[in-house]
Structure formats: C-alpha cells, structure tokens
C-alpha cells in the first residue's frame, strides 16, 4: 500500500472539498457573465480542477496545458517547457489558471506572461496549495486553498515520479522515498 510512504497527512480529503466549495463560491461571483476559460495545468491540477469547477455556478470553458519545470526531480530545473498547449484561442478571454501547487513560481510566471502576450483580457490564478518558502520569482495566486510548509507533498494530483497522485489527501512524503533515488 502506498500509504506506508507517507510521513503524515497535512490536509484531509474533507478539508480539500470544503475549500473547493468556498473557492467555487468566490469564483462564481468573480466570473459571473464573463465565460472564463479555466486552464488546468496537467497532470497535477486535474483532481482539484474537477472538484473546483463543479462548485463554480456560471458559464465557463475548460482547457488544459501540460507545462513542466520538474521532470522526475524534486527541485525545479528552472527551464519551463510546454508539452501540450491550449486548444483554445485566449485573445480577449478571461483566463483562470488552475494549479495544484505554487512552489518556485517559474511555471506560473511564464504562463501569466504567455497569456498576456496572447492578449487575454485578464489572467488570474487559483491554486490548491501555496509553498511561499519555495518561491524564486515574484508571483502570487489570486486565490489560494492552503499554505503548506517547505516539505515534499504528494496526493490529490501531486506526484513524485508520477506516483501518489491518486491519494485522496495531501501528505508529506517520507524523505527516504525520494532520497534513495
């Protein structure tokens, strides 16, 4: 069982769902009548995006990007790479980027600049988790679920080497799991 690799549970499934509902209400007010393009960052944001968008009670569209600065590492490489771009033209659209976690901030800073370059009407960020201690660029989310300490967290979409995404909570991975690789 994969739970044996988890040092402790930081945020329960119930806490995540309650926060998704709370953020959904705020986003409903923010985007009423704006038909936002909600952009999920693959693969990690998928569980949060699914729960969050079910709580947003206004017209919206969904699209996805696969953008990475990690690979299989535990520390950002610093180089942002688009693996899959949007299928939707963002010009004149209100963009809401949905992210699982903001750590270094490089990926989101890159995306905000990219969407502005592509002439989006507005660009805002909602993240399930924020790790301010990991930040290397000056970027802040407009909506944050939870602040987390500078520990290696997995679950609810967040992974280590493509595993642990299916855990229904946010947990701290035992250091011996990633230090042995």
Swiss-Prot record:
Keywords attached to this Swiss-Prot or TrEMBL record, sorted alphabetically, are: Cytoplasm, Glycosyltransferase, Magnesium, Metal-binding, Nucleotide-binding, Purine salvage, Transferase
UniProt pathway: Purine metabolism; IMP biosynthesis via salvage pathway; IMP from hypoxanthine: step 1/1; Purine metabolism; GMP biosynthesis via salvage pathway; GMP from guanine: step 1/1
Q: Tell me the GO BP annotations in alphabetical order.
A: GMP salvage; guanine salvage; hypoxanthine metabolic process; IMP salvage; purine ribonucleoside salvage
What Pfam families is this protein classified in?
A: Pribosyltran (PF00156)
List required co-factors. Mg(2+)
Record: residues binding Mg(2+) = 99-100
Q: CDD domains from the entry? A: PRTases_typeI (cd06223)
Active-site residue numbers? 103 (proton acceptor)
Disulphide bridges:
none
GO terms, molecular function: guanine phosphoribosyltransferase activity; hypoxanthine phosphoribosyltransferase activity; magnesium ion binding; nucleotide binding
**Source organism superkingdom:** Bacteria
- Kindly list the positions annotated as binding GMP: 131, 152-153, 159
Question: Where located?
Answer: Cytoplasm
Q: What is the protein's name according to its record? A: Hypoxanthine-guanine phosphoribosyltransferase
Taxonomic lineage is:
Bacteria, Bacillati, Bacillota, Bacilli, Lactobacillales
